[in-house]
Design a protein with these regions (language model features):
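Intrinsic-disorder-linked linear interaction elements in eukaryotic regulatory proteins
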Residues: 1-86
């Protein structure tokens, strides 16, 4: 959990983790999808709706390709998208 004043540093760390995972592990690795979801949660916590939605949608797209739209992670990501959109 991050205090709002620490958000820029946390955002950079989460973003770097995601970029490294994408580069070295690819989207086939579950932890890459989770890292994208976590960055989306951080954006959402700080009321950055568009950034959060972008992360959740990207993670959802890769999760559906990997495990199908009925997977637990895909359903969780859809819930996040729904909450942020409302």
């Amino acid at each position: 959990y991050v205090k709002l004043e620490n958000y820029p540093m946390a955002k950079e760390a989460f973003f770097r983790e995601l970029e490294l995972r994408k580069k070295y592990l690819g989207w086939e690795d579950e932890d890459t999808i989770l890292a994208c979801q976590n960055l989306g949660v951080l954006h959402s916590f700080c009321n950055e709706r568009e950034e959060a939605l972008a992360c959740f949608r990207e993670a959802y797209g890769h999760e559906v390709k990997k495990n199908g739209e009925d997977s637990e992670m895909a359903q969780k990501l859809l819930q996040y998208i729904s909450v942020v959109e409302s």
